[in-house]
Regions:
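Active-site-adjacent beta->alpha loops and helix N-cap segments on the catalytic face
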Residues: 14, 33-54, 72-75, 96-116, ...
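Glycine-enriched alpha-helix->loop->beta-strand junction motifs that scaffold or abut catalytic
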Residues: 21-27, 52-55, 88-91, 114-118, ...
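Ordered, amphipathic secondary-structure segments that act as subunit-interaction surfaces
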Residues: 81-95
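N-terminal pre-domain/capping segments
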Residues: 1-27, 32-39
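Structural motif corresponding to the early beta-alpha repeats
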Residues: 46-85
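C-terminal alpha-helical cap/extension of soluble enzyme domains
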Residues: 171-248
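Hydrophobic faces of well-ordered beta-strands that scaffold small-molecule active sites
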Residues: 4-10, 27-29, 56-60, 92-94, ...
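Catalytic cores of alpha/beta
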Residues: 11-21, 68-82, 127-142, 163-168, ...
Length: 248
């Protein structure tokens, strides 16, 4: 399995460095992973590009929740994509759907055009489309580089049969990137059952910043109570262990 490419989901410069130290070949750079991953700052992208040599795919997602965007939101996505690519991102990850849950072909075409030959990745918005096989053909026709998917299940392990079908249907016309719940305990089975040549994983551990712990009654998340002490960071050792599992 040593030829399997490992992509790690990251949210900071430090995460990218740890992913590279652990043996990843590529990172998807986001912010706000607790919201499913949003567009990273230009500062984070620029400093990550300076810090690591591996491939960086910049997430282009302006807000949490669904993937049907207003005109203003889509304009922001276009500008963010242009800026990310100007900062030497190796590609962009995006997912744009219609209100009916289908691929928004015209808007996705514009995003692929903006990528201008660099990697254009359709992220896990694919996992909520109503007709995944039709969506796959549409993305192939658009010239999308890669589709990230859990097989429309809670994890790639659970969706392995569907992922295998996508790979069979794709027939090397587009890359299929299994994602969702992949770790060193599940990766071998996912690879065996899908026949994939790459995997995406989010391997994190808790870190703490106790500077806001003096007033526990204060929360910066509005009515949603969340920890103001803990946050997650990429676990370099977990990346290394997963990379080791791929070498077995």
């Amino acid at each position: 399995m040593s030829a399997i490419k490992l992509e790690i989901c990251t949210a900071s410069v430090e995460d990218c460095v740890k992913a590279e130290l652990g043996g990843a070949a590529r990172v998807e750079l986001n912010c706000a992973l607790m919201l499913g991953g949003l567009t990273p700052s230009l500062g984070a992208l620029r400093e990550s590009r300076a810090a690591v040599r591996l491939s960086i795919i910049a997430m282009i997602r302006p807000r949490p929740a669904g993937f049907c965007y207003s005109r203003a939101e889509f304009t922001v996505m276009q500008r963010d994509a242009e800026l990310a690519l100007a900062e030497k991102a190796d590609g962009i990850a995006f997912g744009i759907l219609t209100a009916a849950g289908a691929v928004d072909v015209p808007r996705c075409r514009q995003m692929v055009k903006l990528a201008a030959g660099r990697q254009a990745v359709f992220h896990r918005a694919f996992d909520v489309v109503r007709d995944p096989l039709k969506a796959l053909e549409q993305l192939i026709d658009l010239g999308v580089t890669r589709v990230m998917t859990s097989g429309q299940e809670a994890s790639a392990y659970n969706g392995a049969a569907q992922i295998a079908e996508y790979i069979r249907r794709a027939a090397d016309r587009i890359e299929i990137l299994p994602a969702g719940g992949i770790n060193r305990f599940t990766v071998a089975d996912v690879i065996k059952r899908t026949g994939c040549d790459q995997v995406h994983a989010s391997l994190s551990t808790a870190s703490q910043d106790r500077s806001a712990s003096g007033r526990p009654q204060v929360s910066f998340g509005g009515t949603v109570k969340q920890s103001e002490v803990e946050f997650t960071v990429t676990d370099a050792e977990a990346v290394r262990r997963l990379r080791g599992a791929l070498a077995e």
